[in-house]
């Protein structure tokens, strides 16, 4: 049986048909609807995330792959430049640089052929996640604020290097940025336990030539240091030209400059992208813990009515990759009243961060898409984002089905039939995303489908069907398969 027929019969769901209603649907008979289901229009069919590995692409091969996908029943592609897998054979192909003339020429090849054979194109912003580039100025790069805390003996002289603090706090990111630069924001001694902010002693003036030297009072104390790292992380799996520092998503001017640079470069050769694309796409908002921007303290004061800086050493936890908390019990023990105050400040901090991301990144992206006449698609959730509100303005809000329907992590760790975690249909992401679509009357709820199957090149269609059904249960109406290359 032809692969296309299998895909059409197994993977095209009633949910997808309902999500993309025909203009004349009210006049269609049940017989006509059945015919549409037998041979769906391309917009009802699943799309694929189409990886351009290392941007090592050639015109003839791109055309061949489009036809291969078309014949398999795929309706569209998400063009997704990504880093080349380490250690794999390059097959003597030349890497193209993102936004170079040669790279844009390859876009034209795809746009022309996709249009000719009736396929749809989406285009990712940048490459990898979260997006950025080697060309970003230092002011345009993401920043992170981290807290250092360690007990110090009372009644003795503390003599230590700032370098040791910087080394301990060195951000645990997915891809280290060699340009990362630490800056000391504050330095405190705090009693352990601490019951009031006024008990902390500012010792910032006790640093000379990178050495902290201070007489610690009698008793139990903790040394706190707040450190800001500029250029702290690189794009995860970025292709050449878009693989440098992560963009500061809390800087509206930097975001708009990045977006305009991308479209200005492409449209200078190809004309309006609205003639070629259905949607722009923003991948995972895994900002590696980014939590700061140059005017954050000023914005916090304006919005919350008090100065956040004295509180920050006590509100932050010890963190690791992606900003995941490594240690909640960090630094001095806190009295009940002080702990309650710190929790309230922490909430205000996270609220301010989410507001800035919503206003400066998300709304900037939406406005830019509308100006370009291209639909917006994004995975607008993750640490620091409003899980519901961020999806409300998108034309195509997107969720994800992240794993196989029955594995925890690898073969030999199968989940039993009674395990509610089978298929990840229980997770909140898709439910928030689909709820946002329902609230806005939007019927297309996109999904990065089956992100990790753990069985590369051996996954059965049955396996994909069961896994994608779980996504459909959580409100998904359109699959973008992860992936094809």
Where is each model-derived feature located?
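Positively charged n-region of N-terminal signal peptides that target proteins for export
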Residues: 1-6
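Alpha-helical scaffolding segments of alpha/beta enzyme cores, especially the outer helices
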Residues: 64, 68, 102-112, 116, ...
């Amino acid at each position: 049986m032809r692969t296309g027929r299998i895909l059409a019969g197994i993977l095209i769901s009633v949910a997808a048909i309902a999500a993309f209603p025909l203009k004349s649907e009210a006049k269609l008979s049940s017989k006509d609807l059945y015919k549409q289901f037998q041979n769906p229009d391309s917009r009802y069919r699943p799309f694929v995330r189409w990886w351009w590995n290392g941007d090592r692409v050639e015109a003839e091969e791109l055309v061949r792959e489009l036809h291969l996908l078309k014949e398999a029943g795929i309706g569209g592609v998400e063009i997704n430049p990504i880093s080349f897998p380490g250690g794999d054979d390059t097959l003597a192909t030349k890497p193209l640089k993102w936004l170079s003339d040669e790279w844009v020429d390859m876009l034209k090849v795809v746009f022309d052929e996709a249009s000719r054979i009736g396929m749809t194109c989406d285009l990712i912003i940048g490459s990898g996640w979260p997006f950025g580039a080697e060309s970003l100025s230092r002011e345009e790069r993401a920043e992170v604020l981290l807290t250092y805390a360690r007990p110090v003996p009372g009644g003795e002289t503390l003599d230590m290097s700032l370098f040791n603090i910087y080394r301990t706090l060195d951000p645990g990111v997915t891809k280290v940025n060699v340009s990362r630069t630490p800056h000391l924001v504050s330095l405190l001694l705090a009693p352990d336990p601490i019951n009031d902010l006024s008990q902390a002693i500012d010792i910032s003036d006790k640093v000379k030539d990178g050495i902290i030297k201070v007489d610690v009072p009698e008793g139990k104390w903790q040394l706190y240091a707040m450190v800001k790292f500029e250029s702290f992380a690189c794009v995860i799996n970025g292709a050449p030209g878009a693989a440098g520092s992560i963009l500061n998503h809390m800087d509206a001017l930097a975001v708009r400059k990045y977006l305009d640079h991308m479209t200005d470069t492409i449209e200078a050769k190809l004309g309006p992208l609205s003639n070629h694309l259905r949607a722009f796409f923003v991948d995972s908002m895994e900002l590696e813990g980014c939590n700061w921007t140059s005017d954050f303290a000023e914005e916090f004061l304006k919005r919350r009515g008090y100065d956040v800086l004295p509180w920050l050493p006590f509100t932050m936890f010890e963190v690791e990759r992606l900003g995941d908390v490594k240690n909640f019990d960090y630094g001095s023990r806190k009295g009940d009243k002080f702990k309650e105050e710190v929790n309230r400040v922490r909430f205000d901090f996270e609220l301010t961060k989410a507001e800035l991301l919503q206003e400066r990144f998300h709304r900037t992206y939406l406005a830019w898409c509308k100006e370009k006449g291209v639909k917006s698609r994004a995975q607008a959730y993750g640490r620091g984002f409003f899980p519901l509100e961020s999806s409300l303005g998108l034309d195509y809000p997107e969720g994800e089905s992240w794993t196989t329907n029955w594995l925890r992590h690898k073969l030999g760790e199968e989940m039993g039939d009674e395990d509610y975690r089978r298929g990840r249909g229980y997770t909140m992401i898709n439910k928030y995303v689909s709820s946002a679509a329902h609230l806005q009357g939007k019927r297309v709820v996109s999904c990065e489908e089956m992100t990790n199957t753990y069985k590369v090149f051996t996954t059965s269609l049955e396996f994909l069907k069961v896994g994608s059904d779980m996504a459909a249960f959580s409100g998904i109406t359109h699959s973008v398969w992860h992936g094809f290359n």
